[in-house]
């Protein structure tokens, strides 16, 4: 896109900062806190509009705040303290996000995904499932779901998982039956399989902490605001009943609501077998990779009392290097991993500043006054519903989480009766599950939408139906099960 036609994307964040900064400081806030919030909001607008990559937007915001820290980051009382050096303190704050364990956990998970991709293990697993279950269209839907489920814990980019591994496989399936995109025959099998592909990506993104980068961003925001956190095992156990239900329900539900014309056939299994033969037998690197992944999952689920999840990931990456599953060049050249590493660390830094300047506590008290008189359960459900429906207005899960999660956490902190771990897990699940609502909500959405097998009207209709079902089930399990295992 030409810069001359996109100038407004650059000016909009600056305009938002200026407008908020010119508004009189609300009662109960210090001027530096309000100015910090102005820059923070400008960063969020920049993440939504993306005049430059999101990581650059966040780094520019941090640079502005750090350089102008005497007016944006620190109070007059802090500056007046003997020996207080704002230059050193602002630098310490600016890089604080990079020491957060969440950052290293997601970076390690990206390296796991690199191992899967480089050795072809992820593709092999998906092809094996398609071969074994592809004789019937319904079972083929389950094969797609199970493939996503197996890959999700160690693939923190749902775009890499859905658009990079699963979609390239399933897009080859309709042509086996002489079916073409953007054709009346696409409903025969293509529409059903493509819909299962995007739904499976959204569902598995909610099941595991490491299945989607915004999940880890949420935990970082939660920790910076309250010093509480959710471990990998907490997330997994809290989501377990809903996960089992959705994994078993979704392919059957889609089969009923969006039935394929073609119910069975042998072309898909035969194609998968041919592809597997071309790949050859399971090699030693794939076996080592599989063993390390199983070990990591076991430690993530059961080892929380003995070793931090990030340390598990860090150690497994070291073993992957020693065993030559991946190379050092693979780490250095992984642009996607470094991109997420920088923007996630930067956003956690910005969220920490929002809490340190006192904005979160002020906003929480403001909400507490307006929410008084309502039951905590009613407030929690209302917040989740609002958060979920606002997904319609965001085309980026990162921007969505960055913009709304701090406010949701502040609202929960405003009412001590709301169990924060339960609430944050419900918010986290809503990020992934709500991605089904629109054809632009998350990275793989436009890929599947643009496949030619999902007409616009069908996508919006099915998105609303599945989205509503997901929301109802999330609220029910959030109120009945999550408190049992998290409190």
From Swiss-Prot:
Membrane topology category: Multi-pass membrane protein
Reactions mediated catalytically: (2R,3R)-tartrate(out) + succinate(in) = (2R,3R)-tartrate(in) + succinate(out)
InterPro entries: CitT-rel, SLC13A/DASS
Pfam families: Na_sulph_symp
Highest rank taxon of the organism: Bacteria
Keywords: Antiport, Cell inner membrane, Cell membrane, Membrane, Transmembrane, Transmembrane helix, Transport
Transmembrane segments: 10-30, 33-53, 54-74, 93-113, 137-157, 189-209, 230-250, 292-312, 313-333, 340-360, 370-390, 393-413, 418-438, 465-485
Subcellular locations according to the entry: Cell inner membrane
One GO cellular component, as annotated: plasma membrane
GO molecular function, one term: antiporter activity
NCBIfam families from the UniProt entry: dass (TIGR00785)
Entry's family note: Belongs to the SLC13A/DASS transporter (TC 2.A.47) family. DIT1 subfamily.
Name of the protein described by the UniProt record: L-tartrate/succinate antiporter
Protein source organism: Shigella dysenteriae serotype 1 (strain Sd197)
Designated gene of the protein: ttdT
